[in-house]
Structures are given as structure tokens and as C-alpha cells.
A protein has these predicted regions:
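Histidine/acidic residue-rich metal-binding segments in metalloenzymes
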Residues: 1-76
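Residue-level signal for inorganic ion chemistry
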Residues: 2, 29, 79, 112, ...
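Predominant activation on well-ordered alpha-helical scaffold segments within soluble catalytic domains
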Residues: 13-17, 36, 65, 69, ...
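Conserved active-site and cofactor/substrate-binding residues in soluble primary-metabolism enzymes
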Residues: 7-11, 59-63, 100-107, 121, ...
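His/Asp/Glu-enriched, well-ordered alpha-helical/loop segment
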Residues: 70, 74-75, 82-162
Length: 217
């Protein structure tokens, strides 16, 4: 099996399509920052946007969305990669020394819904790409990915219409350096339950370490 992580270059899409015609052993995903940002609308060499592979141009972004809307991606990942502000070189502006990664796990669903709704993405399809499909890929479909009797009680209460602007004091992960600051997003996570334990209440983290190591069985 071959899995392609974090596809950002649309040039790879046709090759992947052609290969998928002859095998079911090839899977591919992409990440929110490649679908939300584009090179024309971010500052040149700004360390806060540094990631690998890099964020690309608008036309590339459009082609990634076309592929997603036509059921090309097997699922979506977060590629959450936080770092202390000093490692992102926010003060020095040194792009080459900066940590290559974007922190955004908390905003994965709102970011994708904000960008996706404008393009006609159905919320049910988006949720499947973030839950059911990755669970199946990981061999966890017997306990994860659906609201079903006997499954783990992993539940997210999501207000798809509520808008909010990302500010530092609403960020729940330790390191606050993220390019999503000052972005206005549509759709807000209100409550989250992990294994039946409420870990987010009224959009605030209230419980740590409720998760468990997940192993394919």
C-alpha cells in the first residue's frame, strides 16, 4: 500500500487518478492550509506560513478543491505542527531558520467549512472526510467514525452558521503561533466529547488526556 500525505501540488492529481484506475492500494489526503490559503494572498517569506510542502498559488488551490469535490481525496488530515514562537522566528523573520509547520488542529473543521461552503461542499461529505473515512483507513471502523451503538462516544456539537474571528485568547493549544489569527471563520465547535467525556464546553477546553492510544485490531 502507498499513502500520499499532504498533497499540495495539483500536478500530482492526474498521476494519482491514473494510478488509482489500476489499484485500490493507493490513498491520498491533503490538509486545511493547502485548501484555505494561497500564495498570492500571504506575505512573501513570512515564517508563520512556512510548512512542507509549501502553500501554493490560487489556481493550484482551485484544482485541489475540484479534486476534493469530485471525491478524489480519501480523507483529510490536520498536519497539526505547533512550535514555540521563537522557533517560528516571528521576531527575526528568518524564514530559513523557522520551524516548518502550521498549528491548526483546533480550527480544522471551521477552516474547511468556511472555504468549502463557498465552493458548494456538503457538510455531510466534509464530516465523512474527517471521521468515517480516516477511521476506515486506520482499521478503526469498528469503534470510530460514526455515531452508533457500541462505538466510542466521540461527539462534536458544531454550529455551522456561527462566525468568529480567531484571536490568541481563544486558542486552546499551548503555542499560539498560527496563521489563522485574525481570520474570520464560519462554523464554531461548541462542545466536544471524547469516549463519553466532555473535553470542550462552550468552546473552551475543560478536560485533558481523555483520549486513549488507538491500535488497529
Amino acid at each position: 500500500k502507498v499513502h500520499i500525505v499532504h498533497l499540495s501540488a495539483s500536478e500530482g492529481i492526474e498521476r494519482i487518478k491514473n494510478r488509482k484506475k489500476s489499484t485500490d492500494k493507493l490513498t491520498v489526503e491533503t490538509c486545511p492550509h493547502y485548501l484555505y490559503f494561497n500564495a498570492e494572498e500571504i506575505p512573501d517569506a513570512a515564517p508563520i506560513y512556512k510548512c512542507a510542502p509549501p502553500i501554493r498559488e490560487k489556481q493550484n488551490n482551485r484544482l485541489l478543491w475540484d479534486y476534493l469535490l469530485n471525491d478524489g481525496f480519501n480523507f483529510l488530515g490536520s498536519d497539526h505542527s505547533p512550535a514555540p514562537p521563537e522557533r517560528k522566528q516571528l521576531e527575526s523573520g528568518d524564514f530559513f531558520k523557522a520551524w516548518g509547520g502550521i498549528a491548526g488542529l483546533q480550527f480544522t473543521l471551521p477552516v474547511l467549512w468556511t472555504a468549502g461552503k463557498k465552493r458548494g461542499l456538503d457538510l455531510e461529505k466534509l464530516l465523512s472526510l474527517l471521521t468515517e473515512k480516516p477511521a476506515k483507513f486506520l482499521g478503526l471502523e469498528h469503534r470510530k467514525g460514526e455515531l452508533k451503538e457500541g462505538f466510542d462516544a466521540d461527539i462534536c456539537v458544531f454550529n455551522e452558521e456561527e462566525e468568529f474571528t480567531v484571536v490568541k485568547n481563544c486558542i486552546e493549544h499551548k503555542h499560539k503561533a498560527t496563521p489563522y489569527i485574525d481570520q474570520t471563520l464560519k462554523g464554531k465547535i461548541i462542545h466536544t466529547f471524547v469516549n463519553g467525556v466532555q473535553v470542550v464546553k462552550d468552546s473552551k477546553l475543560k478536560e485533558l488526556n481523555a483520549g486513549k492510544l488507538l491500535l488497529k485490531k
